[in-house]
Every structure is written in C-alpha cells, then in structure tokens.
Amino acid sequence: MPKVSVVIRAKNEARYMGETLAAIRRQSYQDFEVVVVDSGSTDGTPEIAERHGAKLVMIDPKEFTYGRALNLGVSRSRGEIIVSLSAHATPEGEQWLGRLVSGFRHRGVAGVYGRHIPRENASFFELLGMKLSGITSLQPKIHQRNARFSNANGAFRRELWEMEPFREELPGAEDIYWARRMQRLGYLIVYEPRAAVYHSHGEPLPRLIRRQLHDQPVILRSWLGSLFEEQPVKEKAEVRGGQFIAK
C-alpha cells in the first residue's frame, strides 16, 4: 500500500478542525501522515492540529495563495499519494481514505476526488451550486476531458505534482487548472462518490457570487487551453465501456 500524506490548509478553523482530524484518525487505511498548513490562525487552530498529532507548517498570510500553501505542505510531506482536504471537510465513515487511494490502482490516473455532502448550514444557492458542479453526485465518473476536481476532498500522485506543481499565482481554482493540465498530458481524473466528506460553507448569496467571480476566470483559462494546446504526444490511459485500459 502506498504511503499517504493528508495535507490540510487552514486559517481559523477551530470549529471543525478537531472533528476532521479525529475522523481521519479513525480510517481503516492507516499508512498516512497529516500535515496542516496554517496561515495565521488566531483561534487555536494550530494547537488543535498539534494535539491530534499533525505536523504543523506555517505560512505568512501575506504570502498565501491556495496553490502556494498546498505546494508548501506537499514539500514538507513524505507520501507517494497526496490527499488535499479542507479543514472543515469532515470524512464520512472509516473507508474514505482507502476509497480515494484505491482509485490509483491504474497508472493512468493522475487524480481522484470525492463527493461533498452539504452540512445543515448550506444555503439554497450553495446547494444549487454544488449540485450543478457535480460534487454531490452518487454516480462515479472517469474524466478524460474538462475535469472537475477538488482540493477540498481530492488526491493526486506526488510524482505528477513534482512535474506540475499547483500554480501559485492563481487566485483560486488551482485544482481544476491542474487537473486539466494532467488531462492534456494524457492522464485521467476519477470521481469516487464513496469517498465522501461533510462540507459546505453556509455562505450568503453575495459571498457565493464573489467566490464564483474569483474562480471562473481561471476555469475559463484552463478550458481555453484545452482547445488550443497541442494534444498529448502519448496517451497514458483510455476508457472503454467505463473500464480503464492502461497503455
């Protein structure tokens, strides 16, 4: 079984951090470490992380971007498979980690992401957005083009991250940008709904709109890249009849 590193980006996440770390520790897949990248918490989040045995890494809030914080956490980790998890995304059940990792049985898979189960505080508009994005779906999916991906509940191969780290200058959607880069190199992205987390933000509509305005230019940029960049020289894998065919 591959060694796994769970990397969590956090700032003032005391409300859910303990719950999330406790759920990780209950996983049946036990060959893992936890790295928490904190960007200036003032509510005791770092202390909670250390109390649960996580390795704590600090990043200056002035230097923070989602991609930079994740790259820093991965650079301080040792796993062959990296799981990126939001501090307020609590794994459901004891098979969550094993189900994410099982998606890498095929060498052609670059990333695996799981389902998001909205918390009770999710607003109507947040629920609608989650449904439209597909991250609440119960249907497994293998993406060959225009993948969704989520660093709130996703995993990727370290060797591919070393080749293509997350873009640190992007304001958001670094996960989707990376996934579509992997697809253009011939890799697959897998959606595994059984690897679920409880996750939502409880945000009002104005903040949801700001988040979308933040992310959509990056998503559009990655989509345009898929139209105009050259096709991969060598396909790593393909899917026939819903099954992986390694090449």
Model-derived features with residue positions:
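Glycine-rich, basic loop-to-helix element that forms the pyrophosphate-binding segment
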Residues: D60-S77
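Short beta-strand-to-loop acidic/aromatic patch adjacent to the donor-nucleotide binding site
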Residues: E80-T90
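Non-catalytic, C-terminal membrane-associated alpha-helical segments of glycosyltransferases
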Residues: P206, R210-K247
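N-proximal low-complexity "stem/linker" segments adjacent to membrane-targeting elements
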Residues: M1-A23
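A recurrent flexible, glycine/aromatic-enriched loop bordering the glycosyltransferase active site
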Residues: P118, S137-F156, P171, Y177
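A conserved acidic beta->alpha catalytic loop
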Residues: D38-P46, T90
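Short, acidic, metal-binding catalytic loop of nucleotide-sugar glycosyltransferases
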Residues: A22-D31
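Conserved donor NDP-sugar-binding/catalytic core segment of glycosyltransferases
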Residues: T90, E94-F125
